[in-house]
Amino acid sequence: SNYSMKACEFAFNLAKTENAEVILLHVYFTPIYASSLPYGDVFNYQIGDEESVKTIIQKVHSDLNALSEKIKEKVASGEFPNVKYSCILREGIPEEEILRYAKEQRPMVIIMGTRGKNQKDIDLIGSVTAEVIDRSRTAVLAIPENTPFKQFSEAKRIAFITNFDQRDLIAFEAFFNTWKSFHFSVSLIHLTDSKDTWNEIKLAGIKEYFHKQYPGLEIHYDVVTVSYTHLRAHE
């Protein structure tokens, strides 16, 4: 898909910068795997049709081979950098297998493509991507299909949303350690439904803390007033 190729573009450019290897992980789901899950967790499949399973597996291999060929073409044309990469197939529930692989192999980052504006607004990043972001201990980059960027180095300004939680400081440290080889400024953003001077005081305090922790990092902050009624209407 187009959004998978956009994720590959980011991954290959990042691997070139970090002298790393790219692993293309694809997870597929078959009726046979579904039959091994607890009753009620799966749809009512008619198990026993081995031909349908064989067809699924053949299509998965065909799609992955097609993706690999596209990548080879882009490397040959110079559109993608020439870095080491390999393909891995796993059977199971996509989000579970992605998280399991990340726990086993501890990659630098997980890069996932997301659909463009032609998809439903309610599914902004996709349920699989959302689940991985929520549960992963590894940094996750969700790359929109239509983003004009080709690599992380093109992002010169980063918005960091904070709710003044202690976990935000831990999250920022993990973020900074992952991307510290790049040059960017950071805007600390707090969303609120009412004006409160304390919010700006708290943001200013976080800014000063970050200045001490990360000298040389350009940091700004802003309080954004939003209507939560409006936000809920779009959930």
Set out the residue ranges of the language-model regions:
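Glycine-rich phosphate-binding loop signature in dinucleotide/nucleotide-binding domains
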Residues: 103-107
